[in-house]
Amino acid sequence: MKQQRQLRRREADETAELPADLPPLLRRLYASRGVRSARELERSVKGMLPWQQLSGIDNAVEILYNAFREGTRIIVVGDFDADGATSTALSVLGMRALGCDNISYLVPNRFEDGYGLSPEVVDQAKARGAQLIVTVDNGISSHAGVAHAKTLGIPVIVTDHHLPGDTLPDAEAIINPNLRDCEFPSKSLAGVGVAFYLMLALRTFLRDKGWFDERNIAPPNLAELLDLVALGTVADVVPLDANNRILTWQGLSRIRAGKCRPGIKALLEISNRDPQQLAASDLGFALGPRLNAAGRLDDMSVGVALLLCDNLGEARVLASELDALNQTRKEIEQGMQAEALILCESLSAVVKRFRAVWRCIILNGIRAWSEFWRRALKSVFTAR
């Protein structure tokens, strides 16, 4: 029995109110991507959603302000993917630019620590002198870790974008656009986007408190962090809604103009990408995988160090390390695929018997598993 297949056509939104002077093809493309108004085509920073709509952000910036004034040791705890690496680097760079000198970071090791702010990671932060923990791209499910930090007298600010569970960790402040009581219109911010909004809010709070005037310094231009926002947003494959399109476009524009971190320049070089011709797909398929390779095979601290690096020469060395890890990752995945295909071929006789004797069809595919396959690569391999 031959199975019939049909591609489903996604109809464009005919109610979209787009500019009349747009070419018909562009109108259809925009409408098919869910763009319904001219406002959603805005690409300037003026079109960004205001940070004031993020619940919990006012409490977070007040805690950070007091930490700045008191010289509190702040540890940023990130995640071991590209979004986590860019979130970590952005938060450290942002707070340093805002006038905080007593700050460092910690990225859990996927193989030794597992995901998120676990009690073990809290102990590591404590050993590094943490007096305040700020999570980025994780923490919304870290109930045990936050509780453990509380017993040690370490307050925690959670910044995350993952969906919350039925209960929230007992943190001093939580910023997540997907909280049930959060009125922030975009629910698609990546972790790096949430971290960027926190820096925007903190700069405003510090300025209103006279922080910059007291130190006779100018408020930093946080647009300089948008290259990291673009990279993390695209690499995390979050939907590019109107707000994320602005963040990504602005970051891409800075990279194309050569106004980006040395680490991103080094990644572009090792990937043979021309910055002036850079597209969002390059962030997702060239730079992102090289960053992710560190977290999948080794330690994402290498990726964060690359993004924090101020020297292009040092950045090139780190980018070469990531490129080598990515090549190893590809070779391992190819081996996994070859093994899986051999397994599937050996099952062909079984599949034929299903069809001939029981008159049924396997619709949902075949699950392949091996205890020798690397856990960190299984999700990528499965997607292929």
Annotated model-derived regions:
Residues 154-169, 384:
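Short, acidic/small-residue loops that bind anionic groups at enzyme active sites
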Residues 79-80, 108-111, 138-139, 161-164, ...:
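Short, ordered loop/turn segments at secondary-structure junctions
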Residues 143, 168, 189-192, 196, ...:
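Amphipathic alpha-helical transducer elements in NTP-driven molecular machines
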Residues 132, 136-150, 154:
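Phosphate/diphosphate-binding loops
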Residues 90, 169-213, 225-229, 234:
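Short alpha-helices
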Residues 2, 9-131, 152-153, 204-384:
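Hydrophobic helix-and-loop "lid/oligomerization" segment in the mid-to-C-terminal part
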Residues 66, 166-176, 264:
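Acidic-glycine-rich active-site phosphate/pyrophosphate-binding loop
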Residues 121, 145, 167:
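Short acidic active-site motifs
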